[in-house]
Swiss-Prot record:
Record has Magnesium as a keyword: yes
Keyword 4Fe-4S: no
Protein name listed in UniProt: CRISPR-associated endonuclease Cas3-HD
Enzyme class: hydrolase
Organism: Thermoproteus tenax (strain ATCC 35583 / DSM 2078 / JCM 9277 / NBRC 100435 / Kra 1)
Gene induction: Repressed by 5 J/m2 ultraviolet light and 50 mM NaCl, slightly induced by 20 J/m2 ultraviolet light, 100 and 150 mM Nacl. Member of the csa5-cas7-cas5a-cas3-cas3'-cas8a2 operon.
Cofactor: Mg(2+)
Similarity-based family: Belongs to the CRISPR-associated nuclease Cas3-HD family.
Length: 226
């Protein structure tokens, strides 16, 4: 049985496996342009591919499958598992890019509804408290060892709302730490990785009716030549 990357109502319009596979194809097409920069910035040219494989991992949660998408945003668990599974400093950047790849939506869900301008850790904890964060579907594609490790951990012990909130607190401390110049460099690295992830994600979502903004479609055409 395939997992689902995109529901319309209760109908699955794109499988998880198809979406990730197509997004990884875009990632490989972009590697000649961004690979050397990623190697220098993150210590690995695979940073974008890792972000692609983690970015929708949260869609495998029972909360997402059940349709509880008003209080549960899938980016949150994808970022959590990237931060907790990856072993190098790159995990902070991959997790941040994953958390922000639908930034307007996550802000609307966790900040806008409460009249806030930013997402607070306490809000994140409260919003996730009643969501079923257990693994609801195991994808059927040849995923990376890091993703396999995350899925094993998830199946054996689902994270709690406190686990996720604590991880985001750790992420925020890392990204905001250091001298002002160091913090700016960190933000630029996140922005660069997020840009590539967004292009790959939109390429992976091609064919979905009405999906993507003008800007995201333009990026896909201009950078991938399609």
């Amino acid at each position: 049985m395939s997992c689902c990357a995109y529901f319309r109502g209760r109908d699955c319009l794109q499988t998880y496996e198809d979406h990730i596979t197509q997004a990884l194809e875009a990632c490989e097409r972009l590697r000649p342009y961004y690979g050397r920069w990623m190697e220098k910035a993150f210590g690995t040219a695979d940073a974008a591919a890792l972000a692609v494989e983690f970015h929708d991992l949260g869609k495998l949660a029972k909360a997402y499958i059940a349709g509880n998408r008003a209080r549960y945003r899938h980016e949150v668990l994808g970022a959590y598992f990237a931060l907790k599974t990856l072993q190098t400093e790159a995990r902070y950047y991959v997790a941040a890019a994953v958390a922000l790849h639908h930034e307007p939506m996550i802000l609307a869900a966790y900040a806008g509804e409460l009249g806030e301008r930013a997402i607070h850790v306490s809000t994140l904890r409260a919003m996730l408290k009643d969501s079923d964060l257990s693994l609801g579907c195991t994808p059927n594609y040849s995923y990376r060892p890091e993703v396999a490790a995350a899925l094993r951990e998830w199946a054996s012990r689902p994270p709690t709302a406190d686990d996720v909130a604590d991880a985001f607190q750790e992420l925020a401390v890392y990204l905001s730490g250091g001298a002002p110049e160091e913090a700016r460099v960190k933000r630029l690295r996140v922005a660069g990785l997020l840009h590539v992830l967004t292009v790959c994600d939109n390429w992976g979502a091609r064919g979905r009716p009405g999906e993507g903004t003008f800007i995201s479609r333009y990026m896909t055409v201009s950078e991938l030549g399609l």
